[in-house]
Amino acid sequence: MTNLTELQNLVDRFHANIDFYKDARNAYNEHSCRIEYIDPLLKLLGWDVANEKGLAPQYREVIAENYSTRTDRPDYTITLRGVPKFFVEAKKPAVDITRDADPAIQTRKYGWNAKHRLAVLTNFEYLAIYDTCHIAHEDDGCAVARYRLYHYTEYVEKIDEIVGLIARDTVYSGDFDAYLDANFPATGGQTQQVDTLFLSQINEWRVALSNELYAQGGRYASLEVLNDVVQEFINQIVFLRICEDKNLPLYHKLKDTITDADQLQPKLEELFRSADRRYNSGMFSGEDIIFDLSCEVIKGMIEDLYYPQSPYLFNIIEPNLLGKICEIFLTEQLVLLENNTIGLGKKKDCQNRSVVTTPTEIVKYMVDKTLSKVCEGKTPSEILNISVADIA
């Protein structure tokens, strides 16, 4: 039950100082707004913002980004036992989120890339809830895909409605997912899910790369060889792009390799060798196909991973989504079409079944129940010696 007296006091305090907060000449920033208003609002909605329950990091209800550090992630990740359910993006009151479209586009991009169906944007003066089933476009206005908009003077009056959308009890009871299923359909209409779109993009590269190599003959006349080398090259490019968005160290950015067409292939090979030395994962240790591909096809592939061609934020896309994409990717293989070009076809053992991934919530529960006690008190080296069987 939300404490209406506390909520009214919060609203009254904001109202008494709103002119100061909204004056851009004053030094009232997002940091202060989060501490004084947005954190308390989330707490009144039941969320343990400060982790007063002392939960382990992987099970925190709210993951808040550092107040004083500007990151490329949403300010709050709201979770169900550690599984992200929606984001909250915060702005200072001087930012008019009802007129300035940039915060809305940013919020929608965050939600879409995480495959969430709603996201919250607030400067406390307003609380906006966005439908994030749709790709955000740079020319969208701030009202596009906006599902609800509340002024702070409405918070007390409409608290039941707000609670029914984003409160902790709503999420933990299952009502949140039921509401989304009824009101935020993930398919149909103009919706395009991030995993479906990215898989389609990968398959386009797969076919383009394969046809270019197949035309050269030799070892590339083998579909088995093509399957392996093309998959490996795509993995390498996507891995490097993910490293960039996650701010992991690289010799230089992937995009830097395409600034000079004459140097593209040597620069990319140099980047691959550098990544192999740094990460020692074996991903870059094999024979690469860089010099067997045209600069045009490589450049097009890399450009597809950057703005403005790309809608993807790889620091937001969850690993489980990438895993799902990989699983579906592996259900198809290269096939030789009647016109002697390469296309894609379902593998025989996948033709009559679909890929169903285990929901993250269930994975976390299973791991907690089966491995937590086994790993308790062990050193990292001891944990590495544990054998785990996945019966499925």
Predicted features and spans:
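A short, conserved, highly charged catalytic patch centered on acidic carboxylates
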Residues: 1-118, 126-167, 171-182, 196, ...
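Preference for the N-terminal adenyl/adenosyl cofactor-binding alpha/beta module
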Residues: 1-24, 92, 163-392
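Short, small/polar-rich loop/turn modules that mediate ligand/substrate recognition or access, typified
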Residues: 123
